[in-house]
Amino acid sequence: FDKAEKLLLSKKEKSNQPGFFVELGYNAQLQKNQAKADSYYKKAIDAVANQPNYAYQIGQAFEQKSLLQQAYNTYEIGQKNNSSMNFDYQMALLQGQMGNLDVMVVKLLDYSYSNVNSTLNVQNQLVLFMQDDAENVFANSLKKELLLRTQKTQDIYWNQFLSWLYVNQKEYNKAFIQEKSIYKRN
């Protein structure tokens, strides 16, 4: 571990990449030195606060080490400090990985609505979660959120999304009803 730390420190000095703080912190964590690890993790997140362009690199480094809360905080700070950055997708998936499925659903649906070109990516991620959902708890939560959105906004987008969900659940009659309502509005 000491050799690894020396190597990481020398690489950090040569390249001045704050992503090495994540590696150094993880090395300390493996040595059961959580205080030292947290110190390095804080330095990595502080680097994002000072230079938001590092957010993706450092967020990914945290994700690769399964440090989900730190990754979420990194993306959040990067997005807050640079409004042109959008990490809503990554943050939504992290919420799902942390077990906050309802929050993930809301964030993914918001993201797909504001970035229509990414709807297919969002749907693919939702399918992955539905495949692991033997009791349909996740699918029912998704359906509930989509039904609320179709009632609140009357936007065809939500009817199309709901139709997609029904097709994935092999509820073709319900999907057909959604498609008919879309057709009548056009």
Residue ranges and their predicted role:
Residues Q31, K65, M98, F129, ...:
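Structural motif corresponding to the intra-repeat A-B loop/turn of tetratricopeptide repeats
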